[in-house]
Amino acid sequence: PVAENLRAEPREFGRLIQDAVGIEAIVNRVTVHESAEVQSEWFQSTHDDYGIENIVLVGGESSNIDYLGPSVVESSELISEINSEPGREIFCGGIAIPSRKVESLRLLKKGSGGIEYFTTQVLYDSDNISKMLGHYQDVCMKEKVSPKRILLSFAPISTERNLNFLKWLGVNIPEATEEYITANQDTIKGRSLEVSMGVLDDVLSHISS
């Protein structure tokens, strides 16, 4: 049902946030479903027409599928070409999915291919992200490269419908966490915030240990 709803233009929403709050917006862009030419035009328009300089590139669901459009690394190369033109500077990011196997190696490859930073999938558990950060640090030290910045993503909810939407998006929510958050409809918002803050505290403790 979500896929059938009319979606707003994310760049327009990003521009509204920038104008209203005064902070730079980050817009996600799936790269694989349209040609390199279309993607390049979209990147240029995002910068020139919407004033958005931060784009997170999102690839396909499987490396076994032959997609029409460019990969994340190929898209970052397109952005590098755009950035070579006077007056254009797009900061190019990628997605980190902590629950995915050997994600640290994917981050290393994408970082070497031009990705400047990563945003995580929405976090409702600290175990996978802590492991991923540790593994990523290890592989970067082994390869003698500097780790890229990783931005942690949180999306507290206020209703069970919000939670179901996150699950539809593929967010990993442990069963025990879901049961705790939804045990009482009147406390979903508070418990969701509590879980998000707990995950952040756990990750910060892991990093500093």
Where are these regions (language model features)?
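Glycine-rich phosphate-binding active-site loops on the catalytic face of alpha/beta enzymes
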Residues: 54-63, 112-128, 209
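Ligand/cofactor pocket segment of small-molecule handling proteins
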Residues: 85-116, 120-125
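Catalytic-face loop-and-helix region of soluble metabolic enzyme cores
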Residues: 145-208
